[in-house]
């Protein structure tokens, strides 16, 4: 439970917002060039069952900062948690003087509702967090897509590392929230000269 609470605090504190959306301008002999960001409009988002509320909160905050709204197609196994998170976001928007329905969801998400969303003429951008199948579907949908697929992050350890600290950090990372997050360490690649020492400290970390 503590790890899940920490994940929500990290989302609240670290999700980029409007401060990351800047206007860039430069001038030269041929005139002035101005680059200014603009919203896509309504973004379609597919979310996983492993981090349902965290993904919905992070997606919505970033998308809203860019002037967008979002319609979610959550993983069916996480629909209750997803609806709860979406309701909290809309309540927060209203309490802050913002609009209602900044984020919405289908009540009974399926592969069919996901396909409808990906083909909808008023949704120009699809964001997907999940396994390789859903990410591949989004990136081959013919629309602009952002895909965050399954991860298998390696921890690389060589002779320049603080071996004891490396062991501690690897164990802390791979046991965080039962290793559910795709960003958590899943494997170790170590140079042969420090393998025995690294194994010693890994065992000491239990």
Regions found by a protein language model. Name each.
Residues 8-9, 107, 121, 170:
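A general structural motif at alpha-helix termini
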Residues 8-9, 75, 120, 200:
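Histidine (H) residue identity feature
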């Amino acid at each position: 439970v503590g790890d899940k609470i920490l994940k929500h605090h990290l989302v609240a504190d670290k999700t980029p917002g409007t401060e990351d959306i800047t206007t860039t301008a430069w001038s030269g002999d041929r005139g002035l060039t101005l680059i200014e960001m603009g919203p896509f409009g309504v973004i379609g988002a597919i979310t996983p069952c492993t981090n349902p509320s965290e993904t919905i909160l992070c997606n919505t905050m970033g998308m809203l900062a860019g002037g967008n709204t979002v319609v979610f197609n959550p993983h069916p196994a996480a629909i209750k948690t997803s609806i709860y998170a979406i309701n909290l976001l809309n309540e927060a928007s209203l309490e802050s003087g913002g609009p209602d329905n900044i984020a919405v969801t289908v009540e009974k998400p399926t592969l069919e509702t996901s396909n409808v969303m990906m083909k909808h003429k008023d949704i120009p951008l699809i964001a997907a967090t999940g396994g390789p199948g859903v990410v591949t579907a989004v990136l081959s949908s013919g629309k602009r897509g952002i895909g965050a697929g399954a991860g298998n992050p390696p921890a690389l350890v060589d002779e320049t590392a603080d071996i004891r600290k490396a062991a501690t950090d690897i164990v802390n990372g791979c046991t965080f929230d039962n290793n559910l997050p795709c960003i958590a360490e899943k494997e170790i690649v170590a140079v042969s000269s420090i393998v025995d020492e690294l194994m010693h400290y890994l065992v000491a970390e239990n």
